[in-house]
């Protein structure tokens, strides 16, 4: 399971700066939920081969009213659900009463905590950081988040216990493409392995869109899973099931009750739990409330699923009982706001009455099969060549970008690796054209497809061309002819 790193500290110690650096963007919102957390941010980060979820919990002032009352409920939940806490302090401002209050709270929770002294640029870092040892939380790690100093070392150290689980051997910071090409036998064996595994299905959506109702509808009336027992709040519930001879694992993030009790409880909603479920799933089923239309929360969750490369099916719930005018408006909004995911199937259902629920699994299987389908190197190369025939790559410095061959780079999501010369200079518009061309040609449905470009080495680069004997004779005759003309 992907680890969660929570950034904790009083205001203005650099949490947002570190968040933006880890997520590599200044607009790295994955899910920002008004009404649940006023200023919390969730992002997906990659650093030194590690993949993790990072949470900016917002500032805590630690006033006399007490740390428990000043820390928002969702910030408390973020700390409780985090695997690692980075307790950020300001080396320039020194140790404050708020820092002491936060440290006391973290000690009581017995979380894996690392003290980070930020803003060490331009000062005597060792002297400035010395007083933070008195917090009693172990070693103090020096960092200048704005400049990136100490960030990589900090994350590597904090996430080392998760390296084996993530299959990490020391890698560089940049993600590398696996250039290994499967043989036909290996590719067939890998596809069979994937097809034999249960499909892990994450049912996600904002609160009260009907996730629990749908899960109970899928599992049947008698299935009961109590979601508020000790130990069930941190991780999602994994429920195995079988349908039409196909095995599934339903990843439930809402907590499941008897259908008769669904309306009697307020759904517990955990953003982190939802994001972790997306990372662990093969297929994501996003539930949208037809009565409310597409909300920003829906787009945030959708963005996270797409960034994770997960196969996707969308279900518009509560479709029964609304008039035709509202249905037309919702369909128009779906076309307008979700046009960029035209590869995903959209279903209109009623989880309460079961209308349309059975058809969801046709699209779920279709999306998973598309995401794990094996395509040979010869087929991918042929499609690549056809795309060039229909629309040539652009000229770069007077030379045409040359694409040589393509092969599969991974499954779920499907990854196509394209080798060629000057591919790094291909404009984004041409890359999008190729991605859409591959999608249409392969009839990929319900899953994003990724293209990766590898620069091919030119074997003649920096080498003097060696002429054949006939070429050498022609060259001498040409030079002799030029000399004769100059002497006349």
From Swiss-Prot:
The lineage of its organism: Bacteria, Pseudomonadati, Pseudomonadota, Gammaproteobacteria, Alteromonadales. The gene is der. Gene3D superfamilies: 3.30.300.20, P-loop containing nucleotide triphosphate hydrolases (3.40.50.300). GTPase that plays an essential role in the late steps of ribosome biogenesis. InterPro entries: G_ENGA, GTP-bd, GTPase_Der, KH_dom-like, KH_dom-like_a/b, P-loop_NTPase, Small_GTP-bd. One of its GO terms (biological process) is ribosome biogenesis. Residues 3-166, 199-372 form the EngA-type G domain. Associates with the 50S ribosomal subunit. GTP 2 binds at residues 205-212, 252-256, 317-320. SUPFAM superfamilies: P-loop containing nucleoside triphosphate hydrolases (SSF52540). The keyword GTP-binding applies. It holds the Pfam family KH_dom-like. This is GTPase Der. One of its GO terms (molecular function) is GTP binding. Belongs to the TRAFAC class TrmE-Era-EngA-EngB-Septin-like GTPase superfamily. EngA (Der) GTPase family. Residues 373-457 form the KH-like domain. It comes from the Bacteria. Keywords: GTP-binding, Nucleotide-binding, Repeat, Ribosome biogenesis. GTP 1 binds at residues 9-16, 56-60, 118-121. Coiled coil: none annotated.
């Amino acid at each position: 399971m992907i680890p969660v790193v929570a950034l904790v500290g009083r205001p203005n110690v650099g949490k947002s700066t570190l968040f933006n650096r880890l997520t590599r963007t200044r607009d790295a919102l994955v899910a920002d939920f008004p009404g649940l957390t006023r200023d919390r941010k969730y992002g997906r980060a990659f650093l030194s081969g590690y993949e993790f979820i990072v949470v900016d919990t917002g500032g805590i002032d630690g006033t006399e009213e007490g740390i428990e009352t000043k820390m928002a409920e969702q910030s408390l939940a973020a700390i409780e659900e985090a695997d690692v806490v980075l307790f950020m302090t300001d080396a320039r401002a020194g140790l404050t009463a708020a820092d002491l209050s936060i440290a006391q709270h973290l000690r009581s929770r017995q979380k894996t905590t690392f003290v980070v002294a930020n803003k060490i640029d331009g000062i005597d870092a060792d002297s400035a950081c010395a007083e933070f040892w008195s917090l009693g939380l172990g070693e103090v790690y020096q960092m200048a988040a704005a400049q990136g100093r100490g960030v990589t070392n900090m994350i590597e150290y904090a996430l080392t216990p998760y390296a084996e689980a993530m299959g990490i051997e020391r890698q560089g910071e940049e993600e590398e493409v696996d250039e290994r090409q499967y043989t036909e036998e290996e590719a067939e064996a890998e596809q069979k392995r994937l097809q034999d595994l249960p499909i892990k299905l994450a049912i996600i959506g904002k609160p009260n869109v009907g996730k629990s109702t749908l899960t109970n509808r899928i599992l049947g009336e008698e299935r009961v899973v109590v979601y508020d027992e000790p130990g069930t709040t941190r991780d999602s519930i994994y429920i195995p099931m079988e349908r039409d001879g196909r095995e599934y694992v339903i990843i439930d993030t809402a907590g499941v009750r008897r259908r008769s009790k669904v309306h009697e409880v307020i759904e517990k909603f955990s953003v982190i739990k939802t994001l972790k479920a997306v990372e662990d799933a093969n297929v994501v089923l996003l539930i949208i409330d037809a009565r409310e239309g597409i909300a920003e929360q829906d787009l945030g969750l959708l963005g996270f699923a797409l960034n994770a490369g997960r196969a996707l099916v969308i279900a518009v719930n509560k479709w029964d009982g609304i008039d035709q005018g509202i249905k037309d408006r919702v369909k128009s909004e779906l076309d307008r706001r979700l046009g960029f995911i035209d590869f995903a199937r959209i279903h209109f259902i009623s989880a309460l009455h079961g209308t349309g629920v059975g058809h969801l699994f046709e699209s779920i299987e279709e999306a998973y099969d598309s995401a794990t389908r094996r395509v040979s190197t010869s087929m991918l190369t042929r499609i690549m060549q056809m795309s060039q025939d229909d629309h040539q790559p652009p000229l770069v410095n007077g030379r045409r970008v040359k694409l040589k061959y393509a092969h599969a780079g991974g499954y779920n999501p499907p990854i196509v690796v394209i080798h060629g010369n000057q591919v790094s200079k291909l404009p984004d518009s041409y890359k999008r054209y190729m991605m859409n061309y591959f999608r249409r040609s392969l009839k990929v449905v319900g899953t994003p497809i990724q293209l990766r470009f590898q620069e091919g080495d030119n074997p003649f680069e920096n080498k003097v061309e060696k002429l054949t004997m006939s070429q050498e004779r022609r060259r001498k005759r040409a030079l002799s002819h030029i000399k004769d003309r100059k002497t006349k």
